[in-house]
Amino acid sequence: MRDIGSQPAAGVRSMKVRDRALEIIRERISRGDPLYDFTGLASRPKVDAASDELRTYLSEALILPEIRELCREHFDAPEYEVLVAPRTTAAVIATILALEPRSVLHVLPEDGEAHPCVEEGCRLAGAEYEEVEESEIPDLDGFDLVVVTGCDVRWNVVSEDTLREVASAEAVTLLDDASGDRVRRLHGQKPGPRYGFDLVVTSCDKLMDGPRAGVLIGRDDLVEGVRRVCEGYGWTVDGPTLAAVKRAFEEFELSSLEARLKELERVYERLKDELDVERTGAGLVFHGVEREVEIGLGLLRRYGIMTITALGYERVDRTLRFNLLTEDAERFGYDRFVEVVKGELS
């Protein structure tokens, strides 16, 4: 079990890197230079609603019921309740606080990297935290809550066998499907509730044109408990956010991602013999790269390529990686991307 602690020095360095990246973005915008999202996070949320629908309380009355039905259809879970949170991380932490578990198991895809929110939620709740890859799953009877990461920060995808095994546990089960809801489906898997998970959460900005909000869908009694925690901490969303969430689910089409997945395969084939590159569920991860942060900042400065390496928050995995399923990756051009990466990393 890993020790839970803070790393203030690393945090300061992360903020300085991110501040520099944001400065470069401002400079490019002021010159009229383009920017391209290779993070999978910089979506283009759309707000389309009458002014009254965007007002506090009115938006909950008018828009939230539509979101509920859209999400039930999207997740193929007609009996589940729906909650919109300001962030997926807020929904995850609120779930842990609501359940007050004594022990939590966090299951990652093989070679996966964990988002820190599950561990942080356990620290706040005073729960024991254990983190394993899917090949190392212990006896699930010893845990009150089991969390599975459907697709990790490098877009490694969990197996269906693991989803079925965990969903059948006696413990409460949560599928953290931030980008996994889209990435897993691209690789032939089903929506989280179809495996029997009690709760599933996804991010509306990851490979969807929605706001940076999280949607939690699950058993009525559990979602109601999470809702109370979110409201108690002020983790609620406003009318424009609800309108953008609604539009994101209305307009989502898997077919556009399927076409880009074919381009990802083609790009990988062109790079694999020249660079130490790994193809994952949604992009490419480059290994053995020195000065990753400097390269990430350089790509942003010269080409407008936005990466997590340059723009990530504290405790983020800064391994150089590119999500090639974004609309911006297509707009940048896959052939151009190959030449740029070869020039920067060869």
Curated annotation (Swiss-Prot):
Pfam families: UPF0425_C. The keyword Repeat does not apply. Keywords: Pyridoxal phosphate. Gene3D superfamilies: 3.90.1150.70, Type I PLP-dependent aspartate aminotransferase-like (Major domain) (3.40.640.10). GO terms for molecular function: L-seryl-tRNA(Sec) selenium transferase activity. The modification N6-(pyridoxal phosphate)lysine is found at residue 206. It comes from the Archaea. NCBIfam families: pyridox_MJ0158. This is UPF0425 pyridoxal phosphate-dependent protein MK0620.
